[in-house]
Curated annotation (Swiss-Prot):
Cell location: Periplasm
EC numbers for this chain: 3.4.21.-
Organism, as annotated: Haemophilus influenzae (strain ATCC 51907 / DSM 11121 / KW20 / Rd)
Pfam family, one: Peptidase_S11
Annotated GO biological process: beta-lactam antibiotic catabolic process; cell wall organization; peptidoglycan biosynthetic process; proteolysis; regulation of cell shape; response to antibiotic
Entry-linked InterPro entries: Beta-lactam/transpept-like (IPR012338), Beta-lactam_class-A (IPR000871), Peptidase_S11 (IPR018044), Peptidase_S11_N (IPR001967)
Gene name per UniProt: pbpG
Protein name per its UniProtKB record: D-alanyl-D-alanine endopeptidase
């Protein structure tokens, strides 16, 4: 079993897995602080920011609806979904599930819902990256489950800045929790980012990401100005969800951002239940399948 696990990991692309980050002033377009900010690493569910942009720009049907099917199953990491299968769901609700709760099945369904094929959708994601000058970025799927979805903190600055132009992304980024209407079901979901979920900071743009190959990632732009500037922190390959939260908070505060009502980070022990993407359960499931 252990040898099989090592074999699986050997199939993943090789990257310099160390934390990289940039603290960026989006008002004056300047780097405030950084470390290895051009380092290329897997970005996991941060991918969904590009998925949202491409969907919003290509979907021409305001009443778009699509069902989650077998086609949307996670065959890479073995993650599940709260969303019911084979029931038409509003694309607006799927967008909410994807950006707030980082639902992978919703991301896959949205890549089929914009009137183009999934392959064409991924092509448009890569074309948009090139258009934005994200030359170190590549996308292989719409969810970020593939470890071949790669980027750098500086490339992600460009995606984050572009996302500020999308009112839907800005609105959904800052939802601490919400309901998803799926047929007759009403599903309660929470934000995968503790800083937003616990209302420590308000977000203008916010997307977490995690697979084992990437570590814990975050693109976060503070909603409120910090000393007359809009400040964002983008970090890849943090060692844990708790560290990602505390690191982001410390950098925001260092450059003049204030936590809402002086709030602090608490109760980090239960963080894993909110994390998106590739978890240990999914990894063990994958090993078991390949060992048969």
């Amino acid at each position: 079993m252990f040898k099989k696990a090592l074999f699986i990991l050997s199939l993943c692309p090789s990257f310099a897995l160390a934390q990289s980050y940039v603290v960026y002033d989006f008002t004056h377009n300047r780097v405030l602080e950084s470390h290895a900010s051009d380092s290329i690493q897997p970005i996991a569910s941060v991918t969904k920011l590009m998925t949202a942009n491409v969907f919003l720009e290509n979907n021409k049907n305001p009443n778009c609806r699509i069902a989650i099917t077998k086609e949307d199953t996670d065959r890479i990491k073995g993650t599940g979904t709260k969303l019911p299968k084979n029931i038409p769901i509003s694309c607006n609700e799927l967008l909410k599930a994807m950006l707030v709760h980082s639902d992978n099945y919703a991301a896959h369904a949205l890549s089929r819902a914009a009137g183009i094929s999934r392959r064409q959708f991924i092509k448009k994601m890569n074309e948009k990256a090139h258009q934005l000058g994200m030359y170190s970025t590549r996308f292989h799927d719409s969810s970020g489950l593939s470890s071949y979805n790669i980027s750098s903190p500086m490339d992600l600055v460009k995606l984050a800045k572009y996302s500020l132009n999308k009112s839907d992304i800005k609105r959904l980024s800052n939802l601490s929790a919400t309901y998803i209407q799926a047929g007759k079901q009403k599903l309660y979901i929470k934000n995968t980012n503790k800083l937003v979920r616990d209302e420590i900071f308000d977000a203008a743009v916010n997307k977490t990401g995690y697979i084992q190959e990437s570590g814990y990632n975050l693109v976060f732009i503070n909603k409120h100005r910090c000393k007359n500037a809009t400040i964002g922190v983008i970090s890849l390959n943090n060692t844990s969800s708790a560290y990602r939260s505390s690191f982001t908070k410390s950098k925001l505060e260092k450059f003049g951002c204030t936590a809402l009502n002086g709030r602090t980070i608490r109760d980090v022990a239960g963080e894993a239940q909110y994390e998106d993407g590739y978890d240990e359960v999914g990894f063990n499931t994958l090993i078991q399948k390949l060992s048969k």
